[in-house]
Every structure is written in C-alpha cells, then in structure tokens.
C-alpha cells in the first residue's frame, strides 16, 4: 500500500504560505487546514511516510502517539476515544497515563499544545479532562510516534473516533471538569 504524505504536504503548504511554526498564526492556519480536510482516519495517519510505527513503546515519556484503542470498560464508560492522541506522562502497571488532547476543544487544545511545547500554556486544571489511563492489552494497533515538529499538525487533525457520545458532549463535559477543578 502506498505511503501518503499528509504531514509533509501540510508542512510544505505552511512553508509556502510563509507560516512560522509554533506561533499563534501557525496554530490558526493548521486549524483552518484541518477543518478543510474533513475526517482523517487512522489508516491515513498510519500510512504517512513521516510517521514512525512502533510495535511497543520505547522511551515513551513525553512523546506523542496515536493508536487504536478499545477501552476495557467500554460498556460502562459514557464515552471514549478509540483513536487517541496521547502525550505519555507516566508508566503504570499494565499500561501508561497520558494526556489525550482530543478531549479539549480546538482553542484549548492549542493552548495545551503551547504548554507542552514549553511556551505559555494552561493552568493545571485545564489538563484534567485529558488525563487517562491506557492498558497495553487494550491497544489494537501499532503505536504511531508523532515527532515534535509534527505535533502542531497532529493536534488539529480531525482524527478522534468517539464511541458512546459525540464531540459536543465530550467538549461540554471537559469544560465542566475544568470549571469544577
């Protein structure tokens, strides 16, 4: 199967448009381009030639990954993301904890990304809805490692695959968690 060039095509388009990476202007530009793409599937991302596929996590802390996931307690959870975008924060028995940026609306996602990239971010309470535990036994694919230069692109790709609820409910619940601390 041919490899796609989603990440490099977007990077080249940004360069041609004179967009400086990791700026407010670039965040707005990538959000607009992502909206124009429509739905992006995991297959599209997995076939991208810039994405490194891994069978297991090697030195995962602080790295961003995408993967297919089938929550162990999917029948009792109100919803979950079956294709999360996770920055791994810690290892745990049988899995890991991470920040799934898909749980944040795009504006807050941009601010969270700024914080993760080392510039002005959000207060800690804003990350609360993104913190999730993932069990490695429930991962249903290889791990797609997203290199830091592509974090900005990956953050705004419309790739979340919600099970149990729509994106509107997820964002409302996330905002509620932020307000309530």
Predicted regions and their residues:
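Hydrophobic beta-strand signal
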Residues: 64-71
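Mixed-charge, Lys/Arg-rich low-complexity intrinsically disordered regions
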Residues: 3-64
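Short beta-strand-centered aromatic/proline hotspots
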Residues: 75-92
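Intrinsically disordered, low-complexity, charged/polar segments
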Residues: 103-181
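Intrinsically disordered, low-complexity coil segments
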Residues: 72-80, 107-111
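Short, solvent-exposed secondary-structure boundary/capping segments
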Residues: 94-102
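General detector of folded, globular domains
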Residues: 85-87, 99-100, 115-117
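A short, compositionally biased
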Residues: 60-61, 91-95
């Amino acid at each position: 199967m041919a490899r796609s060039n989603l990440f490099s095509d977007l990077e080249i388009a940004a360069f041609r448009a004179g967009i400086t990476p990791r700026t407010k202007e670039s965040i707005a530009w990538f959000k607009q381009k992502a909206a124009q793409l429509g739905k992006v599937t995991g297959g599209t991302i997995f076939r991208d030639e810039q994405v490194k596929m891994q069978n297991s996590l090697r030195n995962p802390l602080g790295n961003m990954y995408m993967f297919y996931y089938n929550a162990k307690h999917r029948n009792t959870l109100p919803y979950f993301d079956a294709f999360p975008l996770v920055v791994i924060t810690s290892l745990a028995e049988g899995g890991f904890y991470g920040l799934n940026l898909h749980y944040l609306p795009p504006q807050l996602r941009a601010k969270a990304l700024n914080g993760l990239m080392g510039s002005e971010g959000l207060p800690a309470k804003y990350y609360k809805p993104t913190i999730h535990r993932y069990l490695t036994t429930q991962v249903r694919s290889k791990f797609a490692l997203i290199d830091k230069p592509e974090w900005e692109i990956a953050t705004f790709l419309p790739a979340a695959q919600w099970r149990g609820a729509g994106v509107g409910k997820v964002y409302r619940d996330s905002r509620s968690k932020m307000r309530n601390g």
